[in-house]
Amino acid sequence: MKRLMLLTLLVVVVVPAVPVFAADDDQSIAYFYPLRTRRPVIERELELRVEHEKARDGRSTTVATAIELPILPRWQVEVEVPLVFVDPREGASTAGFGDVSVESKVLVWRSLKYLAAVALGVEGRLPSGSERRGLGGEAAIEPFAALGIAVGDFDVLGSVAYEMNVNAGVKGPNEQELDASAALAWRVHRRFAPLLELATVTRTRGDNEDGLRHRTQVYVIPGFNARVFPGTTLRLGVELPLTSARTHDYAILGGFVKEF
């Protein structure tokens, strides 16, 4: 797994440094906006993201602001700053800043003929939130791959990622998770597209206090995209568990995306 992480980091660092690009680098494929799955697209956007979860031990809401900027035609960097609200079933509610994340993504292949693309990247999470107050405090590295293709009025996206906790002071084995998801959207109108996602999470390493180690969580996410204004998209959906292995009973996922 260390070799996989090093290979991903090498691609992310080396590929953007190549000065020669194809003539169509200023063109992009306009895939829809999924709710969990990553997009293989270089973006210039400002986004407001909201996630509300209801679990057995209480509720939590995360409101995050993210900016995505292209550094080079095939290299993008994203910074996300979250504000977290925690309302436990027992104990006092808390609120504050969560863990800031920084993501680097490289478009390694794209075909305008087939409307297909592949991207590789890595996300780093900084432990800026308070672990004691339940607002974060996790340092992690997450290499990922994303792919997409458009066929007629349908977009198909998929992504896979491996998250590794790197907190130095954690007792016992640091947690690691494999995430995989796929999303399908139907462009019934230029301003509206219903979507459906399937997401899986498998904890491969870490403690087993909640009984989720080596068990695969499966979630289904129905939702939609709506083009509410020129260059502005609303995405909204509900994440529902399909297995007894779960971290929450449901989650409401949403966001406003502003292209600039």
Residue ranges with predicted function:
Residues 1-28:
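Cleavable N-terminal export/targeting peptides
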Residues 22-260:
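Transmembrane beta-barrel domains of Gram-negative outer membranes and organellar outer membranes
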